[in-house]
UniProtKB/Swiss-Prot annotation:
Gene name of this polypeptide: purH
Record's protein name: Bifunctional purine biosynthesis protein PurH
Pathway assigned to this chain's UniProt record: Purine metabolism; IMP biosynthesis via de novo pathway; 5-formamido-1-(5-phospho-D-ribosyl)imidazole-4-carboxamide from 5-amino-1-(5-phospho-D-ribosyl)imidazole-4-carboxamide (10-formyl THF route): step 1/1; Purine metabolism; IMP biosynthesis via de novo pathway; IMP from 5-formamido-1-(5-phospho-D-ribosyl)imidazole-4-carboxamide: step 1/1
Organism: Leifsonia xyli subsp. xyli (strain CTCB07)
GO (cellular component) term, any one: cytosol
Catalyzed reactions per annotation: (6R)-10-formyltetrahydrofolate + 5-amino-1-(5-phospho-beta-D-ribosyl)imidazole-4-carboxamide = 5-formamido-1-(5-phospho-D-ribosyl)imidazole-4-carboxamide + (6S)-5,6,7,8-tetrahydrofolate; IMP + H2O = 5-formamido-1-(5-phospho-D-ribosyl)imidazole-4-carboxamide
GO biological process, one term: 'de novo' IMP biosynthetic process
Domain notes: The IMP cyclohydrolase activity resides in the N-terminal region.
């Protein structure tokens, strides 16, 4: 069955559409009263349902109930409210066609120029652990129908699905109406919104996330419009942020101050979080171009930041800082004196936040409660998508490491080796990381051979390499890499092992009296 076709020569020109009548039905009441006030001040008739109508009416604004428009009461515990020709004819009438206008008059139906709808909180209900029957009740039917009808008819109707668009809508109403371009952009967001919603429902019925241990028939990603970004990785690239409606990460973080986040800011901040949140202890990671230039743990977060910054102060200039604890006033006082692009943490002491806000360009982000990395990750390639389990340390335990050279590490050295192994995972391959006293002192990242990574790490550590420990994200194919580390004074090395020349590598460490452990697990990061 196909939709009707119209002779486009019959279409009348319609760009700016004044708002005279609006249909509002929202679950999320954020910004509702300000929007209703702006519409009422402009003389717009507001038609609404249930609790939305009650909220607007209690604020002192006149509201027309949907039931008085349809002549049919809300029924079946609210399951049927707006599913009626008196509503949908007003949403779908294409008033560029004289015939549609005449039919509305014959039917006694008034058109809508604005629809404001957000859907039942299905994802939030699932996340709350609700029983199946309660989850099913949060599958919206009438809402998506109104959204899709309005978006289809964007030539005549503006559809708004997010409180983030209320301010722009109010400005358009005050300016005399919405333009065709505005309505088309809103329609695109609306269809993305309903697609993500339906995808969430389908995923729930299918049993949530795909099991990657078997071949899944289909992999779906759900994301909703978040915000436009000034540009992408470079100024000539367009970019935007889309957020997982069920996510609890950087895309959902609150910003307390500073300039707008950029594409590169988000990439670096996410990389910094990946580094800092590998540790149970207070930890700070400083990142530049998605690579750590300092990672450290300590008894308190301010000391962790001091140690992380000391690793490479030159590279830390203009970097992104992530902390896995509440930022204290002591840490804020130090950060305030360093040019930093982004600071992200789970919280801020009141005094710390006020101090940081004096840095007008510093982007201050606060993670949502319950921050967690996704269990799966994907990367787009030409013609498809790669999907994998996220690389993470589950119940980290070094007792399974194998001592292959030198003496057993004492408790202090063992703790440093464990720290170094975790920290190295956050470095782009080929990765070598030197550390001492719970802090990185030299990082060799992103080199195309492990010898160059060793050389880079040692050169950055300089005299701090003496007595330090080292980690390699993958095995050493030859003894030349460890020999560079040993010559610089490294006392212990941890690596996966698995090279066909492991015996040569082990012999080199043994001859130098250097402790070496094999973990049996690689941590490439590309």
């Amino acid at each position: 069955m196909n939709g009707p076709r119209h002779d486009t020569s019959l279409f009348r020109e319609r760009d700016v559409v004044p708002i005279r009548r609006a249909l509002i039905s929202v679950s999320d009441k954020t910004g509702l009263l300000d929007l209703a006030a702006s519409l009422a001040d402009a003389g717009v008739e507001i038609v609404s349902t249930g609790s939305t109508a009650q909220t607007i009416r209690e604020a002192g604004h006149t509201v027309t109930d949907v039931a008085s428009v349809t002549g049919f009461p809300e029924s079946l515990d609210g399951r049927v409210k707006t599913l009626h020709p008196a509503i949908h004819s007003g949403l779908l009438a294409d008033l560029r066609l004289a015939s549609h206008e005449e039919q509305l008059k014959d039917l006694g139906i008034e058109p809508f120029e604005l629809v404001v709808v957000n859907l039942y909180p299905f994802v939030e209900t699932v996340a709350s652990g609700a029983v199946d029957d309660d989850v099913v009740e949060q599958i919206d039917i009438g809402g998506p129908a109104m959204v899709r009808a309005s978006a289809k008819n964007h030539a005549n109707v503006a559809i708004v699905v997010s409180p983030a668009d209320y301010a722009g809508l109010a400005a358009a109403v005050a300016a005399g109406g919405t333009t065709w371009g505005q309505r088309r952009e809103l329609a695109a967001r609306a269809f993305a919104h309903t697609a993500a919603y339906d995808g969430a429902v389908a995923a729930w019925f299918a049993g949530e996330a795909p099991d990657l241990s078997a071949v899944a028939e289909r992999f779906e990603v759900r994301a909703e419009w978040g915000q436009p970004l000034r540009y992408g990785e470079n100024a000539h690239q367009a970019a935007a942020l889309y957020a997982d409606p069920a996510g609890c990460g950087i895309a959902q973080a609150s910003q307390h101050g500073g300039k707008e986040m950029s594409y590169n800011n988000y990439v670096d901040a996410d990389a910094a979080l990946r580094s800092a949140y590998d540790f149970a202890e207070p930890a700070v990671a400083i990142v530049k171009h998605a690579n750590p230039c300092g990672i450290a743990v300590a008894g308190d977060i301010a000391e962790a930041h001091r140690k992380a910054h000391e690793c490479d102060p030159v590279s830390a200039y203009g970097g992104v800082i992530a902390a896995n604890r509440t930022v204290t006033l002591a840490m804020a006082e130090t950060v305030r004196g360093i040019f930093t692009e982004v600071l992200i943490a789970p919280g801020y002491e009141p005094g710390a936040l006020e101090l940081l806000k004096t840095k007008k360009n510093l982007r201050i982000l606060e993670l949502p409660v319950g921050y967690a990395r996704s269990l799966t990750e994907f990367r787009q390639i030409s013609g498809g998508v790669l999907v994998q389990d996220t690389d993470r340390f589950d119940e980290f335990d070094s007792s399974g490491w194998t001592l292959v050279a030198g003496a057993e590490a004492d408790a202090v050295t063992r703790a440093d080796l464990e720290f170094t192994w975790k920290a190295c995972r956050a470095v782009k391959s080929n990765a070598i990381l030197l550390a001492k006293d719970g802090a990185s002192v030299g990082v060799g990242m992103g080199q195309v051979n492990r010898v160059d990574s060793c050389t880079l790490a040692v050169s950055r550590a300089a005299e701090r390499a003496v007595g330090a420990v080292a980690a390699s994200d993958a095995f050493f194919p030859f003894a030349d890499g460890p020999e560079i580390l040993i010559a610089a004074g490294v006392a212990a090395i941890v690596q996966p092992g698995g090279s066909i020349r492991d015996e040569e590598v082990i012999a080199s460490a043994t001859a130098a009296g250097v402790t070496m452990y094999f973990t049996g697990e690689r941590h490439f990061f590309h």
